[in-house]
């Protein structure tokens, strides 16, 4: 009886240690990141990751977000994530206030793949793991770029989105939700692709995405790929790479049949009318 007690205590200690053991993940900059076994305090400095965390029902684990979330996702996004109204904002896509960040005691910080290396290093020097998200699967020399050169855009973004969702789900222990989201994305895309299978190239709707200051998305950006999946043709893709400013003469030359404006940029509608 008495010999059994030390063994029981040892077993409990070992079990407790195992339950709190660190784990490793590979982020989308191909960096090995060591994380606590269970994340309950995450800071999110990238809007795409924030959007996915909402869909994975992981917002109860989020204690801080990027300062430009309203600009990036639109003010009406609060309908999907009401807690955003009160969450601290210790940084943004390319900068961080390290004192404010430390005050939140995060166990992990999500950043964009194009976050400055020094920003990532500053957070890591403070002892906080950093996970970079690109939602792309690409060559190593393109991994940290905002405007990548992609040999196969469809493959890079289709597989990269799945990789990113799985990675975020793994970090936040939301694997079942991540797999369900991936399954739904695949099914919905397959449905649309089947309906557009016989659409001739010359019947695709010519479209343009208008952003503030005459900026738009060209080749290598996910926006153009979404347009193509929907049966449209991004008129800017043949002339520009990535996110760039263009001229009104460019837009007139491209002659789009439809101009899209994102809900987060309502002022652009009035600019386009002028």
PLM regions with names:
Residues 14-18:
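N-terminal signal peptide c-region/cleavage motif recognized by signal peptidases
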